Amino acid sequence: MNNSFFRKNSKIYIISGNLKGRKISFKNIPNLRPTTNQIRETLFEWLSKYIKNSRCLDCFAGSGVLGIEAISRYAAFSTLLEIEKKTFLTLKKNIKELNIYNVEIIRTNTLHWLKKTRNKPYDIIFIDPPYHQGLVKKTINLLENKKWIKKNSFIYIEQEKKQSIIVPKNWTLYKKKITNQIQCYLYICST
């Protein structure tokens, strides 16, 4: 096993934009797997024409790297949802150290928040939940049924390999990448 797993804290770096090279610290806790540099680079290359001035929602923020990377690449705003207290507190600390103000961090159960909160739809939504908990399907259903998505919204899904995925008929697959361990999909809402 990788020795970094046993360290109390780890860090990843923002790979592009006005925060390029800045670090994001995170606690090594079960189920926290920040999206790798390679996958993030691919994802944000896919989104490069659409990220500027977008409103982003990071449904299971964890390290917050997806929402923060979006801000670094000139997204207008990111909402980060995280339930785990230590991870949430680390996220708050990172946002303060990065001196960014167009990020909202909410300590909440993502499914509960999507069900109960009223907000306007997001342009880009990141879904990268803990594995083996059936959260992708539940999140997709809430995003669609509670009108969190609008025409031309992008929805990024990262999940363990060999898990099936069923999306609404009005979502069109825009890009996909499959590695040894994960599968990544970027959909666009057509209606």
Swiss-Prot record:
Keywords: Methyltransferase, rRNA processing, S-adenosyl-L-methionine, Transferase. Its EC number is 2.1.1.171. It catalyses: guanosine(966) in 16S rRNA + S-adenosyl-L-methionine = N(2)-methylguanosine(966) in 16S rRNA + S-adenosyl-L-homocysteine + H(+). PROSITE patterns: N6_MTASE. Pfam families: Cons_hypoth95. Transmembrane segments: none annotated. It comes from the Bacteria. The keyword Transferase applies. InterPro entries: DNA_methylase_N6_adenine_CS, RNA_MeTrfase_RsmD, SAM-dependent_MTases_sf. GO terms for molecular function: 16S rRNA (guanine(966)-N(2))-methyltransferase activity; nucleic acid binding. Specifically methylates the guanine in position 966 of 16S rRNA in the assembled 30S particle. This is Ribosomal RNA small subunit methyltransferase D.
